[in-house]
């Protein structure tokens, strides 16, 4: 069974509650945790486009929110960036 959804993941709290040198890694962790919580799956594949978007403006200037398309196939969840 294939299920497709679109999520807007807020990253503002990562910006406000993290030192500038740890924002991008914590944002990637927050994205993974958000998807685990909302898809109820531990097997998550995050597309490289999401990683590039978070790291686009360096380590400390992450986006405030990010929109992703999530496709759930059997036991695998694949997340890609919406432009």
Swiss-Prot record:
Q: Which domain of life is it from?
A: Archaea
CDD domains found in the cross-reference section: Ribosomal_L31e
**Family according to the record:** Belongs to the eukaryotic ribosomal protein eL31 family.
Supply the InterPro entries for this chain. Answer: Ribosomal_eL31, Ribosomal_eL31_CS, Ribosomal_eL31_dom_sf
Q: Which gene encodes it?
A: rpl31e
Can the keyword Ribonucleoprotein be found in this entry's annotation?
Answer: yes
Q: Output one GO BP term.
A: cytoplasmic translation
Database matches in PROSITE patterns: RIBOSOMAL_L31E
SMART domains in UniProt: Ribosomal_L31e
Alphabetical list of Pfam families matching this protein: Ribosomal_L31e
* One function term, GO molecular function aspect: structural constituent of ribosome
Q: Name one GO cellular component term.
A: cytosolic large ribosomal subunit
Task: Provide the organism lineage as a comma list.
Answer: Archaea, Methanobacteriati, Methanobacteriota, Methanomada group, Methanococci
| Keywords of this entry | Ribonucleoprotein, Ribosomal protein
Statement: the UniProt record of this protein carries the keyword Flavoprotein: no
What name appears for this protein in its UniProt entry?
Answer: Large ribosomal subunit protein eL31
Q: Which Gene3D superfamilies match?
A: 3.10.440.10
Q: Which PANTHER family match?
A: 60S RIBOSOMAL PROTEIN L31 (PTHR10956:SF0)
């Amino acid at each position: 069974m294939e299920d497709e959804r679109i999520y807007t993941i807020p990253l503002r709290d990562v910006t406000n509650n993290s030192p500038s040198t740890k924002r991008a890694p914590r944002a990637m962790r927050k994205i993974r945790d958000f998807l685990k919580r909302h898809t109820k799956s531990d097997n998550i594949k995050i597309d490289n486009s999401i990683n590039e978007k978070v790291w686009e403006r360096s380590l400390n200037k992450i986006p405030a929110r990010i929109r992703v398309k999530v496709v759930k196939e059997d036991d695998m969840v694949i997340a890609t960036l919406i432009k």
